[in-house]
Design a protein with these regions (language model features):
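Glycine/charged-rich beta-loop-alpha catalytic/anionic-binding loops adjacent to active sites
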Residues: 3, 30-31, 80-81, 102-110
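Short glycine/serine/threonine-rich phosphate/pyrophosphate-binding segments
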Residues: 14-18, 42-46, 65-74, 93-95, ...
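N-terminal beta-loop-helix "entrance" segment that forms/cooperates
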Residues: 34-56
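Short, glycine-/small-residue-rich phosphate/pyrophosphate-handling segment
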Residues: 92-138
């Protein structure tokens, strides 16, 4: 099985956040790979990964980074494969990572999700891959329909909650 998505993170400490993207890709039956790379500690490996991703069949890269968060932008600067950045909450409540990822110079875009937003990164990757793939579009439609059903169920449960001044 050849991976079409790469999930990249700075270290194993990012895995509890990034496994949300991995679980979604697994659920959608999309082959993916996971690597630990660091823009600061392993720059040569980051360069080799980024420059070789397209030739290896990678169609979307999900990159997570905290603090200075250069990983996403460095990867994006060396490939034409779309990069989705996931800012990791560490110092400054993740705002430093968010701003570092979202404020890319013209010509080097990184699609950025919210702080610790790995699930949305996974969904966005699936949406990118689903362009022109009706089967994958169907899986996405089912996924989103299930989200809707959860809200409908929540409202049914709220209807059973009783308070003296609750009007519905």
């Amino acid at each position: 099985m050849t991976p079409v998505v790469s999930i990249i993170m700075g270290s194993t400490s990012d895995l509890p956040v990034m496994e949300k993207a991995a679980k979604l890709l697994d659920e959608m039956e999309i082959p993916f790979e996971m690597h630990a790379l660091s823009a600061h500690r392993t720059p040569a490996e980051v360069e080799a990964f980024a420059k070789g991703a397209k030739d290896r069949g990678i169609k979307v890269i999900i990159a997570a980074a905290g603090m200075a968060a250069h990983l996403c932008g460095v990867i994006a600067s060396m490939t034409t494969v779309p990069v989705i950045g996931v800012p990791i909450n560490s110092t400054l409540d993740g705002m430093d990572a968010l701003l570092a990822i979202v404020q890319m110079p013209p010509g080097i875009p990184v699609a950025t999700v919210g702080i610790n937003g790995a699930l949305n990164a996974g969904i966005l990757a699936v949406q990118m891959l689903a362009v022109g793939d009706e089967q994958l579009q169907g899986k996405l439609a089912d996924y989103k329909e299930n989200l809707k059903k959860k809200i409908v169920k929540a409202n049914e449960e709220f209807a059973q909650v009783s308070f003296k001044y609750k009007t519905n």
